[in-house]
């Protein structure tokens, strides 16, 4: 059995919602919900929050979770890589789970872990597009090869359907990632790519440098908390049994 760690990067100073990980959601910090749901995923050995903020670390520990203090990091992936180095035993598979996903479904975590077979070094998820999402730049689209590896991720409507209408091949990216521990180190050492900069999509760095990303299917739609309004929606969904 492979040793699997889910590492959740969290920072205090989000520009649109400072202090977001500590925001109250149904009587506990938002970040605690992410930790609790990640622990329900089968095949996970360790769940830890990676942060450079003592307040977040304390809140996680008070809620019964594990927190790893890191230095300042350029990206969440860099923070995850640093935290993975501090775990003992060192994980073989590292899942990078965003800290603003309090409604994450354990099955989505299981799906991305399950994609790490047959020499796959990096994996992520995709779901069917809802009506009207193809044109929305906030929804990242992905197209894949027959093998299931990503051809490209874009905020643009891909693929374009010459016959008109939305292509049944279009899928929305869900931003959960799994890496082998070795490839996580490789990835974070790569120079940022030009397309990565144009699209503001970090995963394009792997494709630009010639590495594959396996894309697995999920029914989880993703629900990140970016604003106080999003938090209110999450409260309503939790109250409804989400």
UniProtKB/Swiss-Prot annotation:
The gene is kdsB. Pathway: Nucleotide-sugar biosynthesis; CMP-3-deoxy-D-manno-octulosonate biosynthesis; CMP-3-deoxy-D-manno-octulosonate from 3-deoxy-D-manno-octulosonate and CTP: step 1/1; Bacterial outer membrane biogenesis; lipopolysaccharide biosynthesis. Activates KDO (a required 8-carbon sugar) for incorporation into bacterial lipopolysaccharide in Gram-negative bacteria. The keyword Nucleotidyltransferase applies. Belongs to the KdsB family. InterPro entries: Cytidylyl_trans, KdsB, Nucleotide-diphossugar_trans. Gene3D superfamilies: Spore Coat Polysaccharide Biosynthesis Protein SpsA, Chain A (3.90.550.10). It is found in: Cytoplasm. One of its GO terms (molecular function) is 3-deoxy-manno-octulosonate cytidylyltransferase activity. One of its GO terms (biological process) is lipopolysaccharide biosynthetic process. It is an enzyme of class 2 (transferase). Keywords: Cytoplasm, Lipopolysaccharide biosynthesis, Nucleotidyltransferase, Transferase. One of its GO terms (cellular component) is cytosol. It comes from the Bacteria. This is 3-deoxy-manno-octulosonate cytidylyltransferase. It catalyses: 3-deoxy-alpha-D-manno-oct-2-ulosonate + CTP = CMP-3-deoxy-beta-D-manno-octulosonate + diphosphate. Its EC number is 2.7.7.38.
